[in-house]
């Protein structure tokens, strides 16, 4: 009898900020911490925030954040920007990493930004992809993502919202993400993260304008022009406020820049991080 196949989203377990944390840790060199998005259609782990090839040139760490994927869910069921940032710092501490580059996707971008503001000594460079981090009126797409209730039809509709190129959305992907969304405990914790009114979730993940304007880090801001989850204006604002920011907008692209323009995305991020490697070598 064959042993049950382990999900590729399961890596190894560490204790971070007191919580059992699933993460993938691969490659060697200067570390990059990847922080995934929040939507049920956004896979954590190696296929989530920033599926780029930097593991060939650097150490890449991709944890499931508190309450997501195969990481522990807090007993009190309470989530906040501050708690997730504490968990991310706990990951760095558990791995003995004093400083790293932070790559944040969507929800994860808001956490990456807040982490850099609260713990500037822990961050070298920032990459913010389709990121929250400033306040904006919640979009219908984000309302749908955060209000998701498990069904295959709902997952298919959600995937269609994420991707500009609908050919990327097939039955296999919808089934895979749907199955992940019906794992025991998933829906209870997800509903607790972003309860209505969900505008509060956007505002909780936003950082203060004064703090953003004081951010010293070189920052790459990336967005899809046709993004229906996080408005392009959020990244335009971040690029205006962050002193050392550069902005790249992908045309013909929704909320999945790292998937819809995978090759260009990989080169863009790797070149940005490699520039810092060269400066500090």
UniProtKB/Swiss-Prot annotation:
Domain of life per record: Bacteria
Protein keywords: Aromatic hydrocarbons catabolism, Hydrolase, Plasmid, Serine esterase
Gene3D superfamilies, sorted: alpha/beta hydrolase
EC number, UniProt record: 3.7.1.9
Biological pathway: Aromatic compound metabolism; benzoate degradation via hydroxylation
Residues forming the catalytic site: 106, 227, 255
One GO location term (cellular component): membrane
Catalytic activity: (2Z,4E)-2-hydroxy-6-oxohexa-2,4-dienoate + H2O = 2-oxopent-4-enoate + formate + H(+)
Name of one Pfam family that matches: Abhydrolase_1
Domain AB hydrolase-1: 31-261
Disulfide bonds: none
Keyword hit for Hydrolase: yes
GO BP: benzoate catabolic process via hydroxylation
Family, per entry: Belongs to the DmpD/TodF/XylF esterase family.
UniProt name for this protein: 2-hydroxymuconate semialdehyde hydrolase
Organism (species): Pseudomonas putida (Arthrobacter siderocapsulatus)
């Amino acid at each position: 009898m064959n042993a049950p196949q382990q999900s590729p989203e399961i890596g190894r377990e560490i204790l971070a900020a007191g919580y059992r944390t699933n993460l993938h840790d691969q490659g060697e060199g200067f570390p990059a911490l990847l922080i995934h998005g929040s939507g049920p259609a956004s896979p954590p782990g190696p296929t989530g925030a920033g599926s780029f090839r930097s593991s060939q040139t650097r150490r890449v760490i991709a944890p499931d954040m508190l309450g997501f994927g195969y990481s522990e869910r807090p007993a009190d069921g309470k989530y906040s920007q501050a708690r997730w940032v504490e968990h991310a710092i706990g990951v760095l501490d558990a791995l003995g990493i004093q400083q790293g580059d932070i790559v944040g996707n969507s929800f994860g971008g808001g956490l990456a930004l807040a982490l850099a503001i609260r713990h500037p000594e822990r961050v070298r460079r920032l990459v913010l992809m389709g990121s929250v981090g400033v306040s904006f009126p919640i979009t219908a797409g984000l309302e749908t993502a955060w209000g998701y209730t498990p069904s295959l039809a709902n997952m298919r509709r959600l995937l269609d919202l994420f991707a500009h190129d609908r050919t990327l959305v097939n039955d296999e992907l919808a089934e895979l993400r749907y199955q992940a969304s019906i794992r025991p405990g998933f829906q209870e914790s997800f509903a607790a993260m972003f309860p209505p009114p969900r505008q509060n979730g956007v505002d909780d993940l936003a950082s203060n304008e004064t703090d953003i304007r004081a951010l010293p880090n070189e920052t790459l801001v990336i967005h899809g022009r046709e993004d229906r989850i996080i408005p392009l204006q959020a990244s335009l604002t971040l690029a205006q406020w962050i002193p050392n920011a550069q902005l790249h907008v992908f045309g013909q692209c929704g909320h999945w820049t790292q998937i819809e323009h995978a090759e260009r995305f990989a080169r863009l991020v790797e070149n940005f991080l490699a520039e810092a490697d060269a400066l500090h070598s």
